[in-house]
């Protein structure tokens, strides 16, 4: 793909620190090593000295915006790349003797046996220069390399971008918020954080933006560039590959736009990246969205609880094909109840008004999102069994002309965020009028997610329940089936309601026929000529 001159200029202005590293590495970062035997270290820490490839390999090292790109090819087939890895400041590596070098690349632990001492020393310098001369970014410090690799690979697929773009509520709300506040974008400099396909950047241009810097760390950046060029807006939008924590911009911006929300608002930890981007925001600048509200409510759903409980009971079998599985029942139960449930539900399963926790994107600090401690107090509106807590979020775009809300509430049209429910392994029975107190503790981890701890207590009693869940490993339960009303919500006989409705419709049809009009499917707009007992629709 050819890169436009405007994009090339933007990339050249990127990251002064990275440029200094490139100069320091050159020519070390652009070299090849032939005759390398590559071995693997297994999870059992066993070293297999036989090559994992059918012959010795050639390693090609070339500078990349993220560090040094390592390509592996066979010596006798250098036109075909077997594997690509990124050597970054986070790469773990160690020298083994005079010719071997151990390196941990993504999920692979490799030992490289070079053909000469000199080759090993040169490769070691490449790795050490990347590690020593390039400081770890905030993103790298908080994120495991394997998690980051998986994350950016996921968002590098067009199909995943399509999934988000086809979320009509999401995409249309963003467009309306931006176009409805064109005064905030007209002739302004805009930063799009985690631009993906660049759709929000295009909205900013539609609203009159003078310049948009679209930052995207995944391979989607190349597709965004293609869209920019094919839509002839390369003079307006500059696509910059890289992470906002690691790039440099040529100027401050008036507005930051982004779609940084994950499940339960905070999952994927993209909000921290969004807040980090404020270092490029001019005083009194705008952020779209401006703040987010996480809603939390206790819920009752015996069906969901039984479903998860029965799954775990698979491990309660004492004669599964002649094998006793019961020793794993406790761990199986723990694993299933550590999974947040992603689906949707009727809000009438909620037993109290939701508690709202606000995240202010204009003023909160990145560190504020490392540990989020939310106190809870619910005044119970209906007697029943509390099976856990339900979560959803709303975000507001506070513009100069109008405020626009994007909601993932169960009362709003469904989005690709759905809602999230966290179960209690030990549900608690609670009565109307009682007060349920406690806390939700979200502790960030290096897998770009959170460990979620729930503690609930019925005030004035000794009854309590708790659970810790892994937000990185949710259970996607949504099937597309219509949401069912919770049991016990009918205040009249559904059967009688149905027949009453049918009787009413029948009476209406009879009256229509007497008046010379035929009602079809309850709509009386057909005329009838009964001269010879034949109906003739007009």
From Swiss-Prot:
Q: What is its EC number?
A: 2.1.1.319
**Which GO terms label this protein's molecular function in UniProt?**
histone H3R17 methyltransferase activity; histone H3R2 methyltransferase activity; histone H3R26 methyltransferase activity; protein-arginine omega-N asymmetric methyltransferase activity; protein-arginine omega-N monomethyltransferase activity
Q: Which sites bind S-adenosyl-L-methionine?
A: 161, 170, 194, 216, 245, 273
Q: Asymmetric dimethylarginine (modified residue): where?
A: 508
Q: Which UniProt keywords apply?
A: Chromatin regulator, Cytoplasm, Methylation, Methyltransferase, Nucleus, S-adenosyl-L-methionine, Transcription, Transcription regulation, Transferase
Q: How is this protein named in the record? A: Histone-arginine methyltransferase CARMER
Tell me where in or outside the cell this protein is found: Cytoplasm; Nucleus
Q: Top enzyme class of this protein?
A: transferase
Catalytic activity line of the entry? L-arginyl-[protein] + 2 S-adenosyl-L-methionine = N(omega),N(omega)-dimethyl-L-arginyl-[protein] + 2 S-adenosyl-L-homocysteine + 2 H(+)
Q: Name one GO biological process term.
A: chromatin remodeling
Q: Which Gene3D superfamilies does this entry report, sorted A to Z?
A: Hnrnp arginine n-methyltransferase1, Pleckstrin-homology domain (PH domain)/Phosphotyrosine-binding domain (PTB), Vaccinia Virus protein VP39
The protein's matches in SUPFAM superfamilies, at most eight in alphabetical order, are given as: S-adenosyl-L-methionine-dependent methyltransferases
Q: One cellular component GO annotation, for this chain's record? A: histone methyltransferase complex
Q: How is it modified after translation?
A: The dimethylated protein is the major form.
């Amino acid at each position: 793909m050819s890169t436009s001159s405007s994009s090339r200029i933007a990339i050249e202005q990127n990251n002064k620190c990275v440029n200094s590293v490139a100069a320091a590495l050159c020519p070390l970062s652009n070299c090849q090593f032939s005759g390398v035997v590559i071995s693997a270290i297994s999870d059992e820490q066993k070293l297999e000295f036989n090559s994992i490839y059918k012959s010795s390999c050639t390693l090609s090292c070339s500078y990349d915006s993220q560090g040094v790109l390592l390509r592996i090819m066979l010596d006798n087939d250098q036109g075909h790349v077997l594997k690509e890895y990124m050597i970054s400041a986070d790469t773990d590596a160690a020298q083994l003797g005079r010719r071997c070098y151990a390196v941990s690349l993504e999920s692979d632990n490799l030992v490289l046996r070079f053909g000469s001492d000199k080759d090993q020393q040169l490769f070691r310098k490449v790795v050490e220069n990347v590690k020593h001369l390039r400081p770890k970014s905030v993103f790298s410090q908080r994120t495991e390399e394997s998690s980051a690799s998986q994350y950016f690979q996921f968002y590098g697929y067009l199909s995943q971008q399509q999934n988000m773009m086809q979320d009509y509520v999401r995409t249309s709300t963003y467009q309306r918020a931006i176009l409805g506040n064109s005064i905030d974008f007209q002739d302004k400099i805009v930063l799009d954080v985690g631009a993906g396909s660049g759709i929000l950047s295009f909205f900013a241009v539609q609203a009159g933006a003078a310049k948009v810097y679209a930052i995207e760390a995944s391979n989607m950046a190349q597709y965004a560039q293609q869209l920019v060029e094919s839509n002839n807006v390369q003079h307006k939008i500059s696509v910059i590959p890289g992470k906002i924590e690691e790039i440099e911009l040529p100027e401050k911006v008036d507005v930051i736009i982004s779609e940084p929300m994950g499940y339960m608002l905070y999952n994927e930890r993209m909000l921290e990246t969004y807040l980090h981007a404020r270092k490029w925001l001019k005083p009194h600048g705008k952020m779209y969205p401006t703040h987010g509200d996480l809603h939390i409510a206790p819920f009752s759903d015996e069906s969901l609880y039984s479903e998860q409980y029965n799954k775990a009971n698979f491990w309660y079998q004492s004669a599964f094909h002649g094998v006793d599985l019961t020793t794993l029942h406790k761990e199986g139960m723990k694993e299933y109840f550590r999974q947040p449930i992603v689906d949707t539900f009727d809000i009438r399963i909620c037993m109290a008004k939701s508690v709202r926790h606000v995240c202010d994107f204009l003023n909160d600090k990145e560190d504020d999102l490392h540990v989020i401690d939310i106190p809870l107090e619910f005044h119970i509106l209906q007697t029943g069994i509390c099976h856990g807590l339900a979560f959803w979020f709303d975000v507001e775009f506070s513009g100069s002309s109008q405020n626009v809300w994007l909601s993932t509430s169960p009362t709003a049209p469904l989005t690709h965020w759905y809602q999230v429910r966290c179960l209690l392994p030990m549900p608690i029975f609670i009565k109307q009028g009682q007060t349920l107190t406690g806390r939700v503790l979200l502790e960030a981890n290096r897998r770009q997610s959170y460990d979620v701890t729930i503690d609930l207590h019925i005030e004035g009693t000794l009854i309590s329940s708790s659970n810790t869940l892994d937000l990185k490993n949710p259970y996607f339960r949504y099937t597309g089936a219509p949401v069912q009303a919770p049991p016990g919500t009918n205040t009249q006989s559904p059967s009688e309601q149905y027949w009453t409705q049918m009787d009413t419709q029948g009476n209406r049809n009879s009256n229509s026929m007497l008046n010379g009009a035929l009602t079809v499917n309850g709509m009386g707009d057909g005329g009838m000529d009964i001269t010879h007992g034949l109906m003739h629709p007009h």
